């Protein structure tokens, strides 16, 4: 049985590992669903720069059990980016947010509206699949959504991605 892993908030210095897992995850999950040329064009170096910028917006030096939430650009929005780590190696990540929903404009934050969670991404290093990492990250996200007062959570799955549909069901 593989060694245990921990879940902790992401930091800017994790950007390269997050980018590596995102690229590997896309190439694994979307093979045959997305044009191969696009998958081949995914670039860890470019994604690292983007990830570093995003992760730099999150609060730093939080205790490991902190939900690492930060106010988003919209009133009442919260965001979190968590990693599964074993021996300092990043095995997967989960990025999620919540915002007060605007009933007239779904997806737009409205102060005082019902808090609705959104799972933006959950990727696991393909070599680490089947070890409970995805379930642990999802469980953490669901607990955080509850703490944020969310009664609903939205996510999108690419049509044909039966592995993801099975996981989320």
Task: For every predicted segment, state its role.
Residues 1-2:
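Basic/polar N-terminal segments that are highly enriched at the extreme N-terminus
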Residues 5, 9-12, 19-127, 135-140, ...:
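Acetyl-CoA-dependent GNAT
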Residues 12-15, 161-162:
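Alpha-helix N-cap/helix-start and coil->helix boundary motif
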Residues 125-127, 131, 159-160:
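Active-site acidic-Proline motif in GNAT/NAT acetyltransferases
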Residues 151:
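Short acidic/polar active-site loop segments enriched in Thr and Asp
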Residues 155-165:
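Conserved beta-strand-loop-alpha-helix junction that forms the acyl-donor binding cleft
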Residues 168-169:
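Conserved active-site tyrosine of GNAT-family acetyltransferases
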């Amino acid at each position: 049985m593989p060694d245990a892993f921990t879940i902790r908030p992401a930091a800017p210095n994790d950007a390269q590992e997050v980018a590596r897992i995102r690229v590997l995850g896309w190439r694994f999950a979307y093979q045959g669903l997305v044009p191969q040329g696009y998958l081949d064009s995914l670039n860890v170096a470019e994604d690292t720069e983007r990830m570093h910028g995003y992760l730099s917006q999150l609060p730093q030096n939080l205790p490991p059990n902190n939900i690492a939430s930060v106010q988003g650009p919209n009133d009442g929005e919260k965001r979190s980016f968590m990693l599964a780590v074993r021996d300092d190696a990043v095995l997967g990540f989960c990025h999620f947010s919540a915002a007060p929903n605007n009933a007239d404009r779904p997806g737009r934050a409205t102060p005082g509206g019902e808090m609705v969670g959104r799972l933006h991404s959950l990727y696991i290093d393909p070599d680490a699949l089947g070890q409970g990492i995805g379930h642990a990250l999802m469980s953490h996200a669901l607990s955080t959504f509850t703490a944020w007062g969310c009664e609903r959570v939205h996510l999108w799955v690419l049509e044909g991605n039966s592995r993801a549909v099975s996981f989320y069901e």
